[in-house]
């Protein structure tokens, strides 16, 4: 039976909250530390002990705090020539420069219908149905990827994002045309945090390239 716990929360190498041992049988605990940074991996370590004083090993979990509205400065972009009869995927690309030593680099991405993200030609994930489907007129999900030094290098780098229609368009078996149908669109924000404390962002805007590619049809049924 649970009799006590210890929780330590760290972010960017510094401790944000440390409870020490608390005598309690509570299975949920409200965070009581300092404000967690956005876009930086947060690690949580938990240990528990029973009434006999026997302690468990340390259990770890990690997460990234989501974007706040004040930090979400990027534009929705698409291909203006895309028509209602088109079903091809759109390919978006942007080069950027890593100028000095990074501490973290975080990519927030919402490609509707579905996206495939590469950094310097290497896929970030094997997921094929990101972001989660929603009614795009009301709510849009986004993904978060914390990039490593193996994925980014000093100098010129490139982010490429292919966006297929998915649930964004195409022909449904019943002939319906939902209100959330439309062109494939992309919203993305890459936040580069340097060791000297400076921050740079690479956001979707009119400087991104967009083109068609090898995928000529990418609806949910085709």
Task: List the predicted regions and their residue ranges.
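Recognizes extended acidic, P/S/T-rich segments that occur
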Residues: 2-41, 51-55, 76
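Surface-exposed loop/edge segments in extracytoplasmic proteins
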Residues: 12-21, 57, 123-127, 198-201
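Accessory beta-strand-rich segments of carbohydrate-active enzymes
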Residues: 40-45, 50-52, 64-69, 82, ...
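Terminal edge beta-strands and adjacent linker/stalk segments
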Residues: 59-62
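Acidic, His- and aromatic-enriched active-site or binding-groove loops in soluble protein domains
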Residues: 69-76
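Short, solvent-exposed loop/edge segments of extracellular or virion-exposed proteins
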Residues: 76-83
């Amino acid at each position: 039976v649970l009799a006590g716990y210890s929780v330590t929360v760290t972010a960017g190498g510094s401790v944000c909250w440390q409870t020490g041992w608390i005598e309690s049988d509570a299975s949920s605990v409200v965070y009581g530390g300092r404000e967690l940074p956005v876009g930086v991996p947060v690690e949580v370590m938990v240990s528990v002990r029973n009434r006999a004083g026997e302690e468990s090993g340390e259990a770890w979990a990690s997460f990234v705090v989501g974007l706040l509205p004040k930090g979400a400065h990027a534009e929705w972009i698409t291909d203006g020539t895309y028509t209602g009869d088109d079903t091809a995927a759109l390919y978006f690309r942007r080069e950027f420069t890593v100028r000095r030593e990074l501490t973290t680099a975080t990519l927030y991405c919402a490609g509707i219908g579905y996206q495939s993200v590469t950094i310097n030609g290497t896929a970030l994930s094997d997921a094929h149905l990101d972001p989660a489907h929603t009614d795009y007129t009301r709510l849009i999900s986004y993904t978060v990827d914390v990039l490593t030094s193996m994925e980014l290098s000093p100098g010129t780098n490139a982010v490429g994002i292919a966006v297929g229609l998915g649930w964004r368009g195409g022909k449904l078996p019943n002939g319906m045309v939902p209100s959330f149908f439309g062109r494939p669109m992309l919203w993305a924000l890459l936040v580069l945090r340097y060791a000297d404390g400076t921050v740079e962002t690479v956001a979707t805007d009119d400087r991104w390239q967009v083109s068609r590619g090898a995928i000529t049809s990418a609806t949910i049924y085709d």
